[in-house]
Structures are given as C-alpha cells and as structure tokens.
Amino acid sequence: MRNVSMTERIIEVVRNTNETKIRVRLNLDGSGQGTLNTGVPFLDHMIDQIKRHGLFDIDIHCDGDLEIDDHHTVEDCGITLGQAFAQALGDKKGLRRYGHFYAPLDESLSRVVVDLSGRPGLFMDIPFTRARIGSFDVDLFSEFFQGFVNHALMTLHIDNLKGKNSHHQIESVFKAFARALRMACEIDPRAAGSIASTKGSL
C-alpha cells in the first residue's frame, strides 16, 4: 500500500496473489473519474456505478485467472477496493460515518445503509429473478461485497425491495451503495475533527 496523499484522501493499493494481481488508485474526494479494467466487463460496469454516483475517482487494473472462472477476480477486486477505502479514510476523524440511500431503476428499488463502524458485517437480501446476467453469475455479487466490507471494516445492509429484471436489481443496488458510501465518507464540518462514536474510536 502506498499513501499518495492523506491530506487529499488519495491512496494506491497493490495486491498480488497466485490468483490475481490488482492495482487500485482511489481518491475519496474526486469527481467520478477513472479507468476500470478488471477483465470482467459486467464487474467494470458495476464499479463504474460506484465511482460515478459516489463521485470517487477509481482506477483499477486486475490480471486474474479468468481461465478458471470469474470468482477470484470478483472477490479480490472487492477485497482490494475495500483495503483502499480503509486506508484512504485514515483515522476517520470528522466523518459522517453513516450513509443511506434508496435508488430506483425502472421497476427495481434498492435500499443500502452503510456504517463505517470498524466492524465488518454484510447483510444482503437480493431476490434475483435469474441466476446469470449474461455470463455473470449473480452469486459473485455477495463475494464482492463480502470482500469489500471485510477489508473496509464497515457494516453494510443491502436490500432490493422490488424488482423483476436482475440487471436492474443489481444496478440499483450499486447506485444506492455508491450514494450511501459517499454520504458516509463525507467530512462533516460541524464535527471539528472528532470521531463519530461515544467510544472515541471507529
């Protein structure tokens, strides 16, 4: 991990294993820019929702063992992106900490609630109407989010409240996630550098 600039909340993370080689550069206070190349086009499409609707600048490049399947790439991209957020958030002073958002996409409606609690937890309910979106296995979304929350050290509640089209269901989830995460990562000018916890730490 290389801290490019904590003042500007910018971080670069490199994670190499026998299964994947990943580089992520993240700017929490960006404008939704960046280049995505995970090797899995539908995953790129979903991470694009995070950067555009969260206004995070994200560059990600992954060389994964896609000849086996997408699993390692999707999970490890979640892990590495989660590590980047944890590092970029630093000591979490002044953070709003909590974020929530409802996002519709046509017939689909999703709610996401985020707590930058320091306690990893994923509570996810998406009643997908089919097992695959194109060639993408929908089971891999839970692997992405589990990897993310475990390493971002956050509690995440995801609920798709209604939806008939699986593409709409997951895209509304990622849009809501982006907006909720953006809210939680914002600096509250009234907090004056304090920690949003009665314990004094997150």
Swiss-Prot record:
Signal peptide: none annotated. PROSITE patterns: IGP_DEHYDRATASE_1, IGP_DEHYDRATASE_2. InterPro entries: IGPD_sf, ImidazoleglycerolP_deHydtase, ImidazoleglycerP_deHydtase_CS, Ribosomal_Su5_D2-typ_SF. It is found in: Cytoplasm. The keyword Cell cycle does not apply. Pathway: Amino-acid biosynthesis; L-histidine biosynthesis; L-histidine from 5-phospho-alpha-D-ribose 1-diphosphate: step 6/9. One of its GO terms (molecular function) is imidazoleglycerol-phosphate dehydratase activity. It comes from the Bacteria. GO terms for cellular component: cytoplasm. SUPFAM superfamilies: Ribosomal protein S5 domain 2-like. Pfam families: IGPD (PF00475). Keywords: Amino-acid biosynthesis, Cytoplasm, Histidine biosynthesis, Lyase. It catalyses: D-erythro-1-(imidazol-4-yl)glycerol 3-phosphate = 3-(imidazol-4-yl)-2-oxopropyl phosphate + H2O. It is an enzyme of class 4 (lyase). Its EC number is 4.2.1.19. GO terms for biological process: L-histidine biosynthetic process. Its main location: cytoplasm. HAMAP family: HisB (MF_00076). Belongs to the imidazoleglycerol-phosphate dehydratase family. This is Imidazoleglycerol-phosphate dehydratase. It comes from Acinetobacter baylyi (strain ATCC 33305 / BD413 / ADP1).
